[in-house]
Protein backbone atom coordinates (compact mmCIF):
# COMPACT_ATOMS: atom_id res chain seq x y z
CA UNK A 1 0.00 0.00 0.00
CA UNK A 2 1.25 3.49 -0.86
CA UNK A 3 2.33 5.62 2.09
CA UNK A 4 3.31 9.23 2.70
CA UNK A 5 5.20 10.38 5.77
CA UNK A 6 6.14 14.04 6.26
CA UNK A 7 8.93 15.14 8.60
CA UNK A 8 10.55 18.39 9.64
CA UNK A 9 13.99 18.13 8.07
CA UNK A 10 15.64 18.15 11.52
CA UNK A 11 13.53 15.29 12.99
CA UNK A 12 14.19 12.19 10.85
CA UNK A 13 12.67 9.77 13.37
CA UNK A 14 9.38 11.57 13.99
CA UNK A 15 6.95 12.17 11.14
CA UNK A 16 4.25 14.75 11.86
CA UNK A 17 1.99 13.39 9.09
CA UNK A 18 1.39 9.79 8.00
CA UNK A 19 -1.20 8.54 5.52
CA UNK A 20 -1.94 5.51 3.36
CA UNK A 21 -5.03 7.17 1.85
CA UNK A 22 -4.70 7.91 -1.87
CA UNK A 23 -6.65 11.19 -1.73
CA UNK A 24 -4.61 12.53 1.20
CA UNK A 25 -1.30 11.51 -0.38
CA UNK A 26 -2.25 13.13 -3.69
CA UNK A 27 -3.42 16.35 -1.98
CA UNK A 28 -0.30 16.74 0.19
CA UNK A 29 2.08 16.09 -2.70
CA UNK A 30 0.15 18.44 -4.98
CA UNK A 31 1.00 21.27 -2.53
CA UNK A 32 4.69 20.89 -3.49
CA UNK A 33 4.09 20.33 -7.20
CA UNK A 34 4.35 16.54 -7.25
CA UNK A 35 1.87 14.47 -9.23
CA UNK A 36 0.80 11.20 -7.64
CA UNK A 37 -1.83 8.98 -9.26
CA UNK A 38 -2.86 5.36 -9.73
CA UNK A 39 -3.06 3.56 -13.06
CA UNK A 40 -4.69 0.25 -13.94
CA UNK A 41 -3.51 -2.03 -16.73
CA UNK A 42 -5.85 -2.43 -19.69
CA UNK A 43 -4.65 -6.01 -20.23
CA UNK A 44 -3.05 -8.71 -18.11
CA UNK A 45 0.72 -8.68 -17.66
CA UNK A 46 2.26 -12.12 -17.31
CA UNK A 47 5.52 -12.86 -15.45
CA UNK A 48 8.43 -12.44 -17.85
CA UNK A 49 6.53 -9.97 -20.02
CA UNK A 50 8.65 -7.94 -22.43
CA UNK A 51 9.02 -4.17 -22.11
CA UNK A 52 6.73 -3.79 -25.12
CA UNK A 53 4.03 -5.95 -23.49
CA UNK A 54 4.29 -3.97 -20.25
CA UNK A 55 3.97 -0.65 -22.07
CA UNK A 56 1.06 -1.95 -24.16
CA UNK A 57 -0.90 -2.62 -20.96
CA UNK A 58 -0.62 1.09 -20.02
CA UNK A 59 -0.54 2.60 -23.52
CA UNK A 60 -3.41 5.08 -22.98
CA UNK A 61 -1.82 6.60 -19.87
CA UNK A 62 1.66 6.57 -21.42
CA UNK A 63 0.41 8.37 -24.54
CA UNK A 64 -1.40 10.94 -22.39
CA UNK A 65 1.81 11.76 -20.49
CA UNK A 66 3.89 11.92 -23.67
CA UNK A 67 1.39 14.33 -25.25
CA UNK A 68 1.15 16.47 -22.10
CA UNK A 69 4.84 16.63 -21.17
CA UNK A 70 6.71 16.02 -24.42
CA UNK A 71 8.68 13.00 -23.26
CA UNK A 72 11.11 11.75 -25.90
CA UNK A 73 12.04 8.41 -24.36
CA UNK A 74 10.02 5.83 -22.44
CA UNK A 75 11.51 2.59 -21.17
CA UNK A 76 10.98 -0.20 -18.66
CA UNK A 77 13.45 -1.01 -15.90
CA UNK A 78 13.29 -4.26 -13.94
CA UNK A 79 15.37 -4.88 -10.82
CA UNK A 80 15.29 -8.14 -8.82
CA UNK A 81 16.88 -9.01 -5.45
CA UNK A 82 19.42 -11.29 -7.16
CA UNK A 83 20.76 -8.52 -9.42
CA UNK A 84 24.57 -8.64 -9.12
CA UNK A 85 24.78 -4.82 -9.31
CA UNK A 86 21.97 -4.10 -6.82
CA UNK A 87 24.23 -2.45 -4.21
CA UNK A 88 25.91 -0.25 -6.82
CA UNK A 89 22.54 0.68 -8.32
CA UNK A 90 21.05 1.47 -4.91
CA UNK A 91 24.01 3.66 -3.93
CA UNK A 92 23.66 5.69 -7.15
CA UNK A 93 20.32 7.12 -6.05
CA UNK A 94 20.74 7.38 -2.24
CA UNK A 95 22.20 10.90 -2.08
CA UNK A 96 20.20 14.10 -2.39
CA UNK A 97 20.11 15.32 -5.99
CA UNK A 98 17.94 17.03 -8.56
CA UNK A 99 17.38 16.75 -12.29
CA UNK A 100 16.96 19.32 -15.04
CA UNK A 101 13.90 17.41 -16.20
CA UNK A 102 10.89 15.93 -14.41
CA UNK A 103 11.50 12.50 -12.88
CA UNK A 104 8.46 10.41 -13.77
CA UNK A 105 8.13 6.77 -12.74
CA UNK A 106 5.24 4.34 -12.87
CA UNK A 107 5.51 1.20 -10.73
CA UNK A 108 4.21 -1.82 -12.67
CA UNK A 109 5.29 -4.16 -9.85
CA UNK A 110 7.22 -4.04 -6.58
CA UNK A 111 8.03 -0.90 -4.63
CA UNK A 112 10.52 1.85 -3.87
CA UNK A 113 10.87 4.93 -1.67
CA UNK A 114 11.16 8.44 -3.09
CA UNK A 115 12.11 11.07 -0.53
CA UNK A 116 11.67 14.76 -1.37
CA UNK A 117 13.31 17.66 0.47
CA UNK A 118 11.16 20.76 0.03
CA UNK A 119 11.80 23.83 2.18
CA UNK A 120 12.30 22.60 5.73
CA UNK A 121 10.21 19.45 5.20
CA UNK A 122 11.00 15.94 4.02
CA UNK A 123 8.31 13.92 2.22
CA UNK A 124 8.84 10.15 2.22
CA UNK A 125 6.69 8.53 -0.49
CA UNK A 126 6.48 4.74 -0.65
CA UNK A 127 5.45 3.87 -4.20
CA UNK A 128 3.95 0.46 -4.93
CA UNK A 129 2.32 -1.36 -7.85
CA UNK A 130 0.09 0.96 -9.92
CA UNK A 131 1.58 4.21 -8.50
CA UNK A 132 2.76 7.00 -10.76
CA UNK A 133 4.95 9.73 -9.30
CA UNK A 134 6.12 12.83 -11.18
CA UNK A 135 8.75 14.93 -9.41
CA UNK A 136 9.29 18.35 -11.07
CA UNK A 137 12.70 19.34 -12.40
CA UNK A 138 14.86 21.06 -9.80
CA UNK A 139 13.19 19.26 -6.88
CA UNK A 140 15.65 17.92 -4.29
CA UNK A 141 15.12 14.21 -3.66
CA UNK A 142 16.66 10.75 -3.35
CA UNK A 143 15.44 7.23 -4.10
CA UNK A 144 15.90 4.05 -2.09
CA UNK A 145 15.09 0.74 -3.76
CA UNK A 146 15.92 -1.23 -0.60
CA UNK A 147 18.68 -3.74 0.11
CA UNK A 148 16.87 -6.50 -1.81
CA UNK A 149 15.24 -4.42 -4.55
CA UNK A 150 12.25 -5.64 -6.48
CA UNK A 151 10.42 -3.43 -8.91
CA UNK A 152 9.40 -3.04 -12.51
CA UNK A 153 8.90 0.59 -13.52
CA UNK A 154 8.12 2.57 -16.62
CA UNK A 155 10.42 5.60 -16.88
CA UNK A 156 9.78 8.79 -18.86
CA UNK A 157 12.54 11.12 -20.09
CA UNK A 158 12.70 14.41 -21.99
CA UNK A 159 16.49 14.20 -22.36
CA UNK A 160 17.76 11.51 -24.75
CA UNK A 161 20.57 10.64 -22.31
CA UNK A 162 18.04 9.62 -19.67
CA UNK A 163 18.84 9.93 -15.99
CA UNK A 164 21.31 12.72 -15.12
CA UNK A 165 21.55 13.59 -11.43
CA UNK A 166 23.01 16.80 -10.03
CA UNK A 167 24.11 16.05 -6.47
CA UNK A 168 23.92 18.64 -3.67
CA UNK A 169 26.68 17.20 -1.48
CA UNK A 170 24.57 17.48 1.69
CA UNK A 171 24.20 14.64 4.19
CA UNK A 172 20.43 14.95 4.67
CA UNK A 173 19.67 11.64 2.94
CA UNK A 174 22.01 9.86 5.37
CA UNK A 175 20.07 11.23 8.35
CA UNK A 176 16.77 9.67 7.30
CA UNK A 177 15.89 5.96 7.64
CA UNK A 178 16.64 3.58 4.80
CA UNK A 179 13.81 1.82 2.99
CA UNK A 180 12.61 -1.48 4.40
CA UNK A 181 9.67 -2.76 2.32
CA UNK A 182 6.71 -4.14 4.24
CA UNK A 183 7.35 -7.75 5.22
CA UNK A 184 11.12 -7.31 5.61
CA UNK A 185 12.48 -7.56 9.14
CA UNK A 186 15.75 -5.63 9.08
CA UNK A 187 17.69 -2.99 7.19
CA UNK A 188 20.85 -3.97 5.30
From Swiss-Prot:
Keyword Metal-binding in annotation: yes
Top-level taxonomic group: Bacteria
Signal peptide region: none
Site entry: May play a role in transmitting local conformational changes: 102
Catalytic activity line of the entry: 1,2-dihydroxy-5-(methylsulfanyl)pent-1-en-3-one + O2 = 3-(methylsulfanyl)propanoate + CO + formate + 2 H(+); 1,2-dihydroxy-5-(methylsulfanyl)pent-1-en-3-one + O2 = 4-methylsulfanyl-2-oxobutanoate + formate + 2 H(+)
The EC number(s) this enzyme carries: 1.13.11.54, 1.13.11.53
Site (Important to generate the dianion): 105
Entry binding sites for Fe(2+): 97, 99, 103, 141
Known role: Catalyzes 2 different reactions between oxygen and the acireductone 1,2-dihydroxy-3-keto-5-methylthiopentene (DHK-MTPene) depending upon the metal bound in the active site. Fe-containing acireductone dioxygenase (Fe-ARD) produces formate and 2-keto-4-methylthiobutyrate (KMTB), the alpha-ketoacid precursor of methionine in the methionine recycle pathway. Ni-containing acireductone dioxygenase (Ni-ARD) produces methylthiopropionate, carbon monoxide and formate, and does not lie on the methionine recycle pathway.
Protein name according to UniProt: Acireductone dioxygenase
Assembly mode: Monomer.
InterPro entries linked to this entry: ARD (IPR004313), ARD_bac (IPR023956), RmlC-like_jellyroll (IPR014710), RmlC_Cupin_sf (IPR011051)
HAMAP family tied to this protein: Salvage_MtnD
Chain positions recorded as Ni(2+) binding sites: 97, 99, 103, 141
Free-text comment on the cofactor: Binds 1 Fe(2+) cation per monomer. Binds 1 nickel ion per monomer.
Positions marked as site (May play a role in metal incorporation in vivo): 96
Enzyme class, UniProt record, top EC level: oxidoreductase
UniProt keyword terms in alphabetical order: Amino-acid biosynthesis, Dioxygenase, Iron, Metal-binding, Methionine biosynthesis, Nickel, Oxidoreductase
GO biological process: L-methionine salvage from methylthioadenosine; L-methionine salvage from S-adenosylmethionine
CDD domains linked to this entry: cupin_ARD
Cofactor(s) for this UniProt protein: Fe(2+); Ni(2+)
Pathway annotation: Amino-acid biosynthesis; L-methionine biosynthesis via salvage pathway; L-methionine from S-methyl-5-thio-alpha-D-ribose 1-phosphate: step 5/6
GO function terms (MF aspect): acireductone dioxygenase (Ni2+-requiring) activity; acireductone dioxygenase [iron(II)-requiring] activity; iron ion binding; nickel cation binding
Family: Belongs to the acireductone dioxygenase (ARD) family.
